Amino acid sequence: MNELYNQRILQLAAEVPHLGRLADPGAQADAVSRLCGSRVHVELCLGADGRVTDFAHELQACALGQASSSVMAREIIGSSAKDLHAVAEQMRAMLKENGPVPSLLDQPDKWKDLEVLSPVRDFHNRHASTLLTFDAVEDCLNQLGW
């Protein structure tokens, strides 16, 4: 279990940007891990082109949920809905199917910090908390028709 909570995960968990709420979110969603009780509340706004223009979130999560949320918060603004769905799908595949670290062809390094979460694949009971931010973001995108 110690390999899960390495220094980089703890650093990401301690430095989570965009905490709080938006004045006028386009969509908002909650995700909860039934196993550990971790919670994420996400709010975002999209431009007409389907790119995220603003983002905020509130967390009551373990270090893994905080670390994945930290990476999301650093990378989401300016990302397209299409890319966010792709990254979420790749993240699930990384954890559940031993897939590669999420990467976009046109921006191969953008989501590279998710690699630090690859050891979670061996701990199935930690998948849900690690994926909370992705579930909530995709819920928001779906609400907005993307």
Please name every model-derived segment.
Residues Q66-A67, A86:
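Alpha-helical macromolecular-interaction surfaces
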Residues L44, R74-I76, A86-A88:
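Short C-terminal domain-edge/linker segments immediately following a structured domain
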Residues R34-C36, L64, N125-R126:
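Secondary-structure capping and boundary motifs in well-ordered enzyme cores
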Residues M1-G20, S79-W146:
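C-terminal binding/interaction regions
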Residues L19-L59:
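Structured beta-strand/loop patches that form or line metal/cofactor-binding pockets in enzymes
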Residues S68-S80:
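Alpha-helical support elements that line or immediately flank enzyme active sites
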Residues Q60-Q66:
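Short, thiol/selenol-centered motifs that function as redox-active sites or metal-ligating centers
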